[in-house]
Amino acid sequence: MEERYIRRNDYITKYLKEMEVFAKNNNVPIVRKQTLSVILDLVKNKVKEKEKNKKGIRILELGTAIGYSSINMASIDNNIVIDTIEKSKKMYDIAKNNIEKVDICEIDVKNRINMYLGDAFKLLQETTEDEIGKKVDICNNKYDIVFIDANKSKYLDYFNICKNLLNDDGIIILDNVLFLGYVLRRL
């Protein structure tokens, strides 16, 4: 078991590094390493909290990009389910491909990362279908963690919607809050 765990982590680490290179070479913004470290610590703490009650955790991510954050979070524990929304069809397709590639060695991220394509405002507020016809019922779920990494000028709007989707002990993480002043100007 120990050997399989090490192989799995080595594969994921290697693949995530390839994703980082792709993001840099193609000017795709992904979460910074320091920020990711904090996010992963928060996810690990939530997993520990929920283990006491024998429950998994649900994460909502706005802004999938290439799937880098989703894969990182999902790889922590097999009891993590992620709903992630991406507006760009190009990014959605890249993320889907990345998630399928990393879905090996018993980590099963593909079945625990639910990807949706479309406008987050619509998909967050009503039971509907996304742009590829997949049923979306995010508005009726409760989340342990919401990670907002989408259109920076809309953070306050996203926050106001997402706070109603949190469990009582849930947390919202906003990436790049100081990004070029887009978020601060709204406050």
Feature locations, PLM:
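A short alpha-helical cap/connector motif
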Residues: M1-I145, K152-I173, V177-L187
